[in-house]
A protein has these predicted regions:
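Structural/interface elements that position substrates and couple domains in central-metabolism enzymes
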Residues: 2-288
């Protein structure tokens, strides 16, 4: 694995965390900030000095660079981890545009790792675009993997692979705490991720919806003293994009859409109640 040539497309929180992890493992890593024309060399000592992307941007250390197309053309592994700024229907267009830019200079026998959530069938579209742009054939002279990064503190246990083919070097790059990754088919990985997301949000929203009916102080106090007090805003926000991406897989009404829409509405409702409570507290205490 040592010396594997890796390019991470996107100086996002997730992208930098992955790049740092692999640089510390000894990979030859370049990370691409989409707002600049160059790929930045990320060495192990830099990754150890700057634990997150915010600290790197604040200090602005002098780092070696090379043109993006040169870095990508030499990459054995290209991780797609862009910053997404659009919302609603424009998200898919933005992702496809950036993905096309990222893969244009890829060469034969390289591998693409897609880290954004796609919902059901989204990876088939990505693979078609990959083959069209590069002129290469997935599973034959270029590889495609699906690794949705919903939570950096708990990376996926499985890697979706075209035809379920294993890649031991990639597994080593992504393995943390000696927990080896399992390779499954692309469609299987989409389903596993959907189950994880829906299970988490269904449980979370059940708690939020039930607790909102607690009116008296005794009940509120008892509920606050339980494990429910360990729920933070990050727990609600992380994975929300994954949930909405899953929802975009369907047209019309079905049981899964009820679960998805109910979870989204539950989170929105909690946010509104939280804002109202904060405003009420500020007003009550004459604070601004």
């Amino acid at each position: 694995m040592a010396g594997a040539k890796v390019v991470v497309y996107g100086l996002s929180t997730e992208g930098y965390a992955l790049a740092s992890q692999m640089a510390i493992k000894g990979a030859d890593v370049y990370i691409i900030d989409e707002s600049t024309p160059s790929a930045i060399s990320l060495k192990a000592e830099i990754a150890k000095t700057y634990p997150n992307v915010s600290s790197l941007k604040e200090d602005e250390p002098l780092l070696a660079m090379e043109p993006i197309d040169v870095a990508v053309s030499k990459a054995q592994y290209l991780f797609f981890t862009p910053r997404i700024r659009k919302t609603g229907q424009d998200v898919k267009t933005e992702i496809h545009s950036k993905f096309k830019d990222a893969i244009t200079s890829l060469k034969k026998n390289s591998s693409v790792i897609f880290t954004l959530p796609t919902g059901f069938g989204g990876n088939n579209e990505n693979i078609s675009l990959l083959e069209h742009v590069t002129g290469l054939q997935a599973g034959k002279n270029i590889s495609y993997f699906y690794y949705p990064l919903e939570d950096l503190n708990q990376q996926p246990k499985i890697i979706g692979s075209f035809n379920g083919k294993e890649d031991l070097v990639l597994s080593d790059l992504l393995t943390t705490n000696k927990k080896e990754k399992k390779f499954v088919g692309i469609s299987s990985s989409e389903h596993f991720h959907a189950i994880d997301i829906l299970s988490r949000f269904s449980g979370l929203c059940s708690i939020l919806e039930v607790c909102k009916y607690a009116q008296d102080e005794i009940t509120k106090k008892d509920l606050s003293s339980s494990n429910f007090q360990e729920i933070f805003l990050d727990n609600m926000i992380n994975g929300l994009f994954d949930l909405k991406s899953l929802g975009s897989s369907f047209e019309g009404s079905n049981s899964l859409m009820y679960l998805i829409n109910g979870s989204v509405k539950g989170i929105d409702g909690y946010m509104k109640r939280l804002i109202d409570e904060i405003r009420g507290t500020l007003k009550k205490n004459d604070l601004k």
